[in-house]
Amino acid sequence: MGEQQLILTNKLLEEMKLQDYQKDNTIYIDEDITSESIELWARQLKNLCNKQLSRPKEERSPVKLIINSAGGSARDTLYFIDLMEYYKKRDIEIYTYITAYAYSGAFKIGICGSKRFAYKHSELLCHQWNKFEYGVKTYQDTVNDRERNDRLYNELAEVIVSNTKITREMLDDYTKHNRDFVMTSKTALELSVIDEIVE
């Protein structure tokens, strides 16, 4: 009985979120980034942005992304960022709000907003992406993987460098020493990772 109630409660919360996002022009990025979660958020983003596109520019409202996520899939993250850029180029403003934390892919989505906000005690984390592999691979497989991995690393680095004051040298140094780049909201503001601290 308890498990059934939990499932019903979760379904009810999801339905409420789906209804509220249209009313508030707000999308909640509040779980791990997977192909499933990104597909949901992408549909919501397209829906909200297309509604704004149907209005005259002076009547448009910004779409808000409320971010509280530990990140996840790098390629799915880049897809969502591409979608954000598509609408930003069409004069749709997308505001990002980092609440408790934004790590990894969520960090990268956060820095791509038209305006970017975090709270006083928010924590942001930028790090090299991780990859999990299984099975036996040939030498050529590993060569091909290295090329793909290098390309993905460069794509992710470009997102960070082009949207903040974090330099490629800083990123490469953290990667070389296998360190996470953890930031307070104050440090994030100094590095142009965010534009404003909400207090």
Q: Which ranges hold each PLM region?
A:
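N-terminal organellar transit peptides
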Residues: M1-F107, I111-E199
